[in-house]
Amino acid sequence: MANLKEIAERAGVNIATVSRFFNNRKLVKASTAEKIDAIVKEVGYQQRARRQGPRTPDRIGIRHFRVMIVLNSASNIEHYFHWGAVSRFISAVFDEFQKLDISMEFCIVGEDGSIPERLNPDYCDGAVICSEPVQPEVRERLHQRLHGISTVNTILNANCENNDFDVVKFDSAEISRLTARFFAEKDVKEIVLFPELKVRFKHNELIDGLKQECDRIGIRWTDLTGSVDADVPMNEYYKKLSDVFLKVENAAGMAFITSADMLGVLNELRARGIDIRQYEYISAFACEHTLRYFGKVPPFIDVKHKELGIMTAKRLLDRIHSFNRLPRTEIVIAPELRLLD
């Protein structure tokens, strides 16, 4: 097997030129690149994959050690940090950047449409959009400023689907796996799957994935989808749904798709004097303040907001690392999570 030295000798160049060819052939003259390429194919040389070094700021391309959190107004700061699930999301983003000693600053678009001068590539390494201006002209100016900066959009931004940025979908199968694992860790043997609100989506990917994962792990499940006529009044709907649920024997887990269903059913159970703390449950859309309404509640997962925050931070680091090669902005968004409490 030929090595770099032999290839360099046959091509009549030095080893540094051959090394540059393998790193990026555009750094080598076209005629030299063709000569080296022909020799490589002739001798059957295969470049061994280099072991990736530690993920240091220098390797990633961090220069300013500063990332901006873009908000539409100052009131959003108080709103986000008083909202339990979203607070965990943003805190997770902060924690990931702190591991690399990267600070985060708020960049607030003024009510008059002014955009802080700090939002520029000479001041920050990247940006995380939590909310955007509703005025089209201001949003367009903001996008123009962001196109020179590595940027990640988030599910917190109500306008994230109204622009030309790429979309990275959050895998609903992963939520299903975590849900089933959650019940398994609690030693729950049987769960009840509550339908989408008013049975609008009978073949929800999240529920289908949860069924498959429960079957694999060995957790029995009962699906209440279709068990109650969706056309009955809402209060009657939850009463009948609760009636069906209470007939399921040995059910220790409750899997909700919407927090509206969870709120309706748990209210009905509590009105009947049933202690809901005996159940382990999860809701795909449940946020902490919804659960706090019931006082002390059993363990739950609240849509993986923390994991989504970690994913957002890592996505931005990837964007900073490859920004020169892929100058595009990406959106971290989960269709299943769009209906936030």
Report residues per predicted region.
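N-terminal helix-turn-helix DNA-binding module of bacterial transcription factors
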Residues: 1-56
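Bacterial carbohydrate/catabolite-sensing allosteric modules
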Residues: 4, 10, 41-44, 49, ...
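Short boundary motifs at domain starts and secondary-structure transition points
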Residues: 54-61, 118-119
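Interdomain hinge and pocket-entrance segments immediately C-terminal to HTH DNA-binding domains
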Residues: 58-79
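Surface-exposed acidic loop/strand-edge motifs in secreted or periplasmic proteins
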Residues: 108
